[in-house]
C-alpha cells in the first residue's frame, strides 16, 4: 500500500468526523466505509478507531446490529477501548440482549469507576435484568396455571373465560408469547381446539395469533407444527367469529413471513428457513378453499379477503407482480366459479350475502395489478373461455351461471366486463332470459342487465331493446324480488344521461314515479334486506335527477330507513348508499363552466350540459340540512367501520366527499362531531385514493378549525389528525385547504407539548413559515397564529436563534401591520420567544431598524391584548441585557410605560397596566430610574 493510500484513509476518517459532527450521518458512514477499505490491514489501531466511529453512526441510524458488530471489531484490537465498549453496550440494550449489555458496561465501570454515566447505566440494566428474570419465572407459572384451568372440569364458566382471555393478553407481549411457546404451548393449544367448543377454539386461535405477530421464527415453527390444512379446516367452520379469528392468524403469519418482522437477529437469522415455500403453500390452500363445498360462507369470505389483501402489490412502483400472476394461473377460474353461484339453485357453494361482491373486488384488484397488455389479454381470455364454456342451449342452469359470472365481473373490473358483455350473443341471452318462465332466470338476467348498462352505449342498446321487456316484467310479475330488480333496471336506464338536464332518457315525470316506488319499497319493513337493497340501488341511479334527490331529501322516513339498512350485516349496500348521498349533496367533481366556452360550443353545435334548477346552491344547502336532521352522520360512522374488502377505496372517496359537503356550514359542525363524525373521518383521511384522502383531510380541518379538538377527537385519536392536516399545507393544494389546515393546526398546537412535537415531526414547520410570507392576508394570519402556538417548542426557538435567515425580522415587521388579528398573533409569538430566549430579545434589535417604532406602536395600541403582548416584550428586553435596557429607558418608551402604569385600574386593560408597572419596577431594580419623591 502506498503512502498516498494511507493518507487517503486518514483524510477519509477526518472527513467522516466532520460529517458526523454536522449531523450528516449517511455521508459519514460512506467516508468511514471507504476509509476501512483503503486502510492498511496491519494498522489495527487506526482500523479500530474507524470501526468505533462507524459504530456511533449506526447507533444514530438505529441500525443496532451493525453498531454492535463494528464496536466488537474495535474491541478485538483493544479490549479496554471504553468508547467501543459503551457503544456496544447501547446497541446490545436496544437489541434486547441485556445480559451482554450489562457485561460491557461493567467493564466500562471497572476502567472508569467514577464515571456517573457508566454507574447509572449499570444500575439501570441490573434492575431491568432482575425484573426480566422475575417476570419470566412468574410468567411460566401463570401460563401453566391458565392451561390447568382450561383443561380442568372447572364448572365456573367465568373463571375459564378469564383464563382464556389472560392467555390471549399474555401472547400479545413478546416475553409472554415466548414463554407459552417454550412451555409446550402449541400442542396444548391444539388440544384446546380439538375440544370443539367455540369459546376454546377462539381462545386458542387468538393466542396463536399473538404468538405469530412480528416473529418470523416462531410463526414458521407454529405453521409447521399446526399445519396449514388444519388451520384451513378451522376457518371453514360455519362460525363467523372463528372464521375471522383464523383469518387474522393467517394474516399475522403472512406479515411475519413476508417481512413484517422488523427485528434484526444478526447471526440467528441464518437459522430461519426461506419462507417463500410456506407463503406459496398458504396461497394455494386459500385458493382451494374458495371453491370447496366443505367451506362455510364465512370461511369463504375470509379466504377471499386474505387473497384481496395479500396478493396484489402494496406498492405499485414495485415491478414484481408474480404473486398476482400465480393466483390468476391457479385460481382465477375458482374465483369466477364463486362469482357465478346462484343461491336459489340446488347444489351451490355455501355463501353469505357479501361473498359475490368480495369475489368481484378480488377480481378488480387482480386486474388492476397487471402490468402490461399481454397479462391483461391472458386474464380476459381465461374469463372469456370460462363464460363460453358455461353456455349450453340444453342446460338453463349453466346459462344463468355464465350470466351471473358476467355480473360478478361487471361489479369488479367493469372495463373487462363491458368487453365480455359485448361478445356476440351475450346481450341477446340476457334479454332472452328476462322473458323466461323461471323466476330465477329472470332474477339473474335482470341483475346482469343492470350491471351491464353502466356505459351510455350499452344503456342505449337496452333502451331500444330492453325497456319494454323490463316494463312488462315490472307490471306482470307477482314476485317482489323480480319486480324491484326490473324497476332498478328502468331506474338505471332512466339515469343514463347523468345529471345533464338536457339528456333525460325518459319522459318528464317518469323518473319521479320510479323513485317514488323505490322509496315505498325502502320503507317496507316486511321485505327482506336484499330486496330493499335493490330499492337503494334504484335511488343511487335516479338521484342523478335533481327532482328525485329533492323529493328524497324531503322524505325523512325513507332517509332514516336507508340509514338503518347501513347497520345490517349485508354490507354490499354501502356503495349504493354512498352514491345516493354523493348525488343528494352534489359532492361530485364539477368542471368550471366558462361562459365563453359555452357560447363557442353552441356556435359549433356541440352538446352543452345543462344544470337543473334544483342543483343550485340554496337547494343543495337545504338537502344537506335535512340529511343531517335524519342522522346521516351516524350512518356514515357505521359505514366507515365496514371491512376493507367491501369498503373499497372508491367508496371511501365518496364518503369523504359527503363528509366535506356536510361540514361546509360552520353551524353544522357541532352536530357532526356529536354524532361521531370527527372520529369517522380519521381512517378516511389516512387510507384510500389520493383524492379521497384530501377531501377527508379537508373535512377534518374544517372541524378542527372551529371545535375543541379534545372533544372532536377524544383520546389518542387526536394525534392521528395531525398528518392529514399537514398534507393540506402543500403548495399544490388550494388556498381554502391551506387556510383551514393552518387554523386546525393552530387549535391542536394550543393544547399540549406532545401535539406540538407531533406537528414538528410531520415536517409542518417549513410550510407554516412559508405561509407567513404569503400575500393572502387570511392565510398569512392563520400561519402566524399557528406559529404563535408553536414557539413554546425548543426546536422552533432554535430556528429563530439561527443566523442567516429573516424569520425574526418577519415576525417583528408583522407586528407593525395594520390587521389586528395578524398583529396580535405576531406580538404573542414575539413575547413568548423573548421570554424563552434572552438572546432573541437582543437579536430583534439587530434585524430591523424599525424595531423600536413598532414596539412603541404595540405598547400604545387600542386593543388591550395587543398592548399587553407589546409590554411583555418590553419587560423581556429589560430583563435580557443591561445595554438594551438602558437604550429603552433613554427612548420615548419610558414615557409610554409611565403613562400606561399611571392609568386607573380597569378590568379590560388590567393585564397591560400590570405589565407596564412590572417594566418600571424592573428598570428601577436595574438602577436605570429612581422612584419619584416629593
From Swiss-Prot:
<dbReference type="InterPro" id="IPR011990">
    <property type="entry name" value="TPR-like_helical_dom_sf"/>
</dbReference>
<dbReference type="InterPro" id="IPR016024">
    <property type="entry name" value="ARM-type_fold"/>
</dbReference>
<comment type="function">
    <text>Acts as a co-chaperone for HSP90 and is required for proper folding of the myosin motor domain. Plays a role in sarcomere formation during muscle cell development. Required for myoseptal integrity, myofiber attachment, motility and craniofacial development. Is necessary for normal early lens development.</text>
</comment>
<dbReference type="GO" id="GO:0005737">
    <property type="term" value="C:cytoplasm"/>
</dbReference>
<dbReference type="GO" id="GO:0051879">
    <property type="term" value="F:Hsp90 protein binding"/>
</dbReference>
<dbReference type="GO" id="GO:0030239">
    <property type="term" value="P:myofibril assembly"/>
</dbReference>
<dbReference type="InterPro" id="IPR019734">
    <property type="entry name" value="TPR_rpt"/>
</dbReference>
<dbReference type="GO" id="GO:0061077">
    <property type="term" value="P:chaperone-mediated protein folding"/>
</dbReference>
<dbReference type="GO" id="GO:0030018">
    <property type="term" value="C:Z disc"/>
</dbReference>
<keyword id="KW-0517">Myogenesis</keyword>
<dbReference type="GO" id="GO:0048471">
    <property type="term" value="C:perinuclear region of cytoplasm"/>
</dbReference>
<keyword id="KW-0217">Developmental protein</keyword>
<dbReference type="InterPro" id="IPR000225">
    <property type="entry name" value="Armadillo"/>
</dbReference>
<dbReference type="Pfam" id="PF11701">
    <property type="entry name" value="UNC45-central"/>
</dbReference>
<dbReference type="GO" id="GO:0002088">
    <property type="term" value="P:lens development in camera-type eye"/>
</dbReference>
<feature type="repeat" description="ARM 3">
    <location>
        <begin position="753"/>
        <end position="792"/>
    </location>
</feature>
<keyword id="KW-0221">Differentiation</keyword>
<feature type="repeat" description="ARM 2">
    <location>
        <begin position="216"/>
        <end position="255"/>
    </location>
</feature>
<keyword id="KW-0802">TPR repeat</keyword>
<comment type="subunit">
    <text>Interacts with apobec2a, apobec2b, hsp90a.1, hsp90a.2, hsp90ab1 and myosin.</text>
</comment>
<feature type="repeat" description="ARM 1">
    <location>
        <begin position="174"/>
        <end position="213"/>
    </location>
</feature>
<feature type="repeat" description="TPR 1">
    <location>
        <begin position="9"/>
        <end position="42"/>
    </location>
</feature>
<dbReference type="GO" id="GO:0060538">
    <property type="term" value="P:skeletal muscle organ development"/>
</dbReference>
<dbReference type="GO" id="GO:0055001">
    <property type="term" value="P:muscle cell development"/>
</dbReference>
<dbReference type="GO" id="GO:0007519">
    <property type="term" value="P:skeletal muscle tissue development"/>
</dbReference>
<dbReference type="InterPro" id="IPR011989">
    <property type="entry name" value="ARM-like"/>
</dbReference>
<keyword id="KW-0963">Cytoplasm</keyword>
<keyword id="KW-0143">Chaperone</keyword>
<protein>
    <recommendedName>
        <fullName>Protein unc-45 homolog B</fullName>
    </recommendedName>
</protein>
<feature type="repeat" description="TPR 3">
    <location>
        <begin position="83"/>
        <end position="115"/>
    </location>
</feature>
<dbReference type="GO" id="GO:0031672">
    <property type="term" value="C:A band"/>
</dbReference>
<dbReference type="GO" id="GO:0048738">
    <property type="term" value="P:cardiac muscle tissue development"/>
</dbReference>
<dbReference type="GO" id="GO:0055002">
    <property type="term" value="P:striated muscle cell development"/>
</dbReference>
<dbReference type="InterPro" id="IPR024660">
    <property type="entry name" value="UCS_central_dom"/>
</dbReference>
<feature type="repeat" description="TPR 2">
    <location>
        <begin position="48"/>
        <end position="81"/>
    </location>
</feature>
<keyword id="KW-0677">Repeat</keyword>
Amino acid at each position: 500500500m502506498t503512502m498516498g493510500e494511507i493518507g487517503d484513509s486518514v483524510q477519509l476518517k477526518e472527513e467522516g468526523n466532520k460529517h458526523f459532527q454536522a449531523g450528516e450521518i449517511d455521508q459519514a458512514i460512506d467516508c468511514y466505509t471507504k476509509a476501512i477499505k483503503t486502510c492498511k490491514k496491519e494498522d489495527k489501531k487506526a482500523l479500530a478507531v474507524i470501526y468505533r466511529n462507524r459504530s456511533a453512526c449506526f447507533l444514530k441510524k438505529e441500525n443496532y446490529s451493525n453498531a454492535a458488530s463494528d464496536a466488537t471489531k474495535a474491541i478485538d484490537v483493544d479490549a479496554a477501548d471504553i468508547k467501543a465498549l459503551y457503544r456496544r453496550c447501547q446497541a446490545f440494550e436496544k437489541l434486547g440482549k441485556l445480559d451482554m449489555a450489562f457485561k460491557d458496561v461493567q467493564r466500562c465501570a471497572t476502567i472508569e469507576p467514577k464515571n456517573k454515566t457508566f454507574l447509572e447505566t449499570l444500575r439501570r440494566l441490573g434492575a431491568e435484568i432482575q425484573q426480566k428474570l422475575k417476570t419470566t419465572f412468574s410468567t411460566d407459572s401463570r401460563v401453566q396455571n391458565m392451561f390447568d384451568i382450561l383443561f380442568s372440569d372447572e364448572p365456573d364458566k367465568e373463571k375459564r373465560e378469564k383464563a382464556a382471555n389472560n392467555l390471549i393478553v399474555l401472547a400479545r407481549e413478546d416475553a409472554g408469547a415466548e414463554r407459552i411457546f417454550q412451555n409446550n404451548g402449541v400442542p396444548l393449544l391444539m388440544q384446546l381446539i380439538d375440544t370443539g367448543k367455540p369459546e376454546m377454539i377462539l381462545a386458542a386461535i387468538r393466542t396463536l395469533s399473538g404468538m405469530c405477530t412480528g416473529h418470523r421464527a416462531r410463526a414458521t415453527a407454529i405453521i409447521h407444527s399446526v399445519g396449514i390444512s388444519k388451520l384451513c379446516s378451522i376457518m371453514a367452520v360455519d362460525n363467523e367469529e372463528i372464521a375471522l379469528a383464523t383469518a387474522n392468524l393467517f394474516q399475522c403469519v403472512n406479515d411475519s413471513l413476508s417481512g413484517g418482522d422488523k427485528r434484526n437477529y444478526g447471526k440467528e437469522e441464518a437459522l430461519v428457513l426461506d419462507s417463500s415455500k410456506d407463503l406459496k403453500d398458504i396461497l394455494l390452500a386459500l385458493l382451494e378453499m374458495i371453491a370447496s363445498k366443505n367451506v362455510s360462507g364465512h370461511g369463504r369470505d375470509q379466504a377471499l379477503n386474505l387473497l384481496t389483501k395479500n396478493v396484489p402489490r402494496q406498492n405499485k412502483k414495485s415491478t414484481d407482480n408474480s404473486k398476482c400472476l400465480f393466483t390468476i394461473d391457479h385460481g382465477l377460474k375458482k374465483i369466477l366459479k364463486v362469482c357465478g353461484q346462484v343461491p336459489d339453485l340446488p347444489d351451490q357453494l355455501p355463501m353469505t350475502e357479501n361473498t359475490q361482491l368480495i369475489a368481484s373486488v378480488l377480481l378488480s384488484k387482480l386486474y388492476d395489478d397487471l402490468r402490461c397488455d399481454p397479462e391483461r389479454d391472458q386474464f380476459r381470455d381465461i374469463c372469456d373461455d370460462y363464460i363460453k364454456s358455461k353456455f349450453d342451449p340444453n342446460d338453463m342452469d349453466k346459462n344463468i351461471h355464465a350470466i351471473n359470472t358476467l355480473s360478478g365481473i361487471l361489479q369488479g373490473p367493469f372495463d373487462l366486463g363491458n368487453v365480455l358483455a359485448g361478445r356476440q350473443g351475450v346481450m341477446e341471452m340476457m334479454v332472452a332470459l328476462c322473458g323466461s318462465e323461471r323466476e330465477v332466470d329472470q332474477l339473474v338476467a335482470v341483475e346482469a342487465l343492470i350491471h351491464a348498462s353502466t356505459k351510455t352505449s350499452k344503456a342505449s342498446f337496452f333502451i331500444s331493446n330492453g325497456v319494454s321487456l323490463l316494463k312488462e316484467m315490472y307490471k306482470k310479475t307477482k314476485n317482489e324480488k323480480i319486480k324491484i330488480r326490473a324497476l332498478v333496471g328502468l331506474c338505471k336506464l332512466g339515469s343514463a344521461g347523468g345529471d345533464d338536464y338536457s339528456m333525460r332518457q325518459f319522459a318528464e315525470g317518469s323518473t319521479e314515479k320510479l323513485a317514488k316506488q323505490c322509496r315505498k319499497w325502502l320503507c317496507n319493513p316486511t321485505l327482506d334486506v336484499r330486496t330493499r337493497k335493490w330499492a337503494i340501488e334504484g335511488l343511487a341511479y335516479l338521484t342523478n335527477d335533481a327532482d328525485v334527490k329533492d323529493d328524497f331529501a324531503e322524505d325523512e322516513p325513507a332517509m332514516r330507513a336507508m340509514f338503518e339498512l347501513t347497520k345490517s350485516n349485508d354490507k354490499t349496500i354501502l356503495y349504493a348508499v354512498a352514491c345516493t348521498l354523493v348525488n343528494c349533496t352534489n359532492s361530485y367533481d364539477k368542471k368550471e363552466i366558462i361562459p365563453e366556452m359555452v357560447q363557442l360550443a353552441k356556435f359549433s353545435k356541440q352538446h352543452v350540459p345543462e344544470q337543473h334548477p334544483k342543483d343550485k346552491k340554496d337547494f343543495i344547502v337545504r338537502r344537506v340540512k335535512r340529511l343531517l336532521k335524519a342522522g346521516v352522520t351516524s350512518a356514515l360512522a357505521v359505514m366507515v367501520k365496514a371491512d376493507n374488502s367491501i369498503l373499497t377505496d372508491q367508496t371511501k372517496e365518496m364518503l369523504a366527499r359527503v363528509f366535506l359537503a356536510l361540514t361546509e356550514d360552520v353551524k353544522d359542525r357541532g352536530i357532526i362531531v356529536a354524532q361521531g363524525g370527527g372520529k369517522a373521518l380519521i381512517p378516511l383521511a389516512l387510507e384510500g385514493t389520493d383524492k379521497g384522502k384530501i377531501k377527508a383531510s379537508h373535512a377534518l380541518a374544517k372541524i378542527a378549525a372551529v371545535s375543541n379538538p379534545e372533544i372532536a377527537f377524544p383520546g389518542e385519536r387526536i394525534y392521528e389528525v395531525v398528518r392529514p392536516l399537514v398534507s393540506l399545507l402543500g403548495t399544490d393544494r388550494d388556498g381554502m385547504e391551506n387556510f383551514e389546515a393552518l387554523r386546525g393546526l393552530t387549535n391542536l398546537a394550543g393544547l399540549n407539548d406532545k401535539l406540538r412535537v407531533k406537528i414538528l415531526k410531520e415536517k409542518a414547520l417549513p410550510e407554516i413559515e412559508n405561509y407567513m410570507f404569503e400575500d393572502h392576508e387570511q392565510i398569512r394570519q392563520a400561519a402566524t397564529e399557528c406559529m404563535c402556538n408553536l414557539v413554546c417548542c425548543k426546536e422552533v426557538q432554535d430556528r429563530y436563534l439561527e443566523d442567516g435567515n429573516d424569520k425574526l425580522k418577519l415576525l417583528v415587521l408583522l407586528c407593525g401591520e395594520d390587521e389586528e388579528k395578524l398583529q396580535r398573533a405576531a406580538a404573542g409569538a414575539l413575547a413568548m420567544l423573548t421570554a424563552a430566549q434572552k438572546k432573541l430579545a437582543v437579536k430583534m434589535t439587530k434585524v430591523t431598524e424599525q424595531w423600536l417604532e413598532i414596539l412603541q406602536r404595540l405598547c400604545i395600541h387600542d386593543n388591550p391584548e395587543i398592548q399587553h403582548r407589546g409590554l411583555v416584550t418590553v419587560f423581556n428586553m429589560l430583563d435580557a441585557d443591561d445595554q438594551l435596557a438602558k437604550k429603552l429607558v433613554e427612548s420615548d418608551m419610558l414615557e409610554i410605560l409611565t403613562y400606561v402604569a399611571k392609568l386607573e385600574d380597569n378590568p379590560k386593560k388590567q393585564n397591560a397596566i400590570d405589565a407596564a408597572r412590572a417594566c418600571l419596577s424592573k428598570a428601577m431594580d436595574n438602577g436605570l430610574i429612581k422612584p419619584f419623591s416629593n
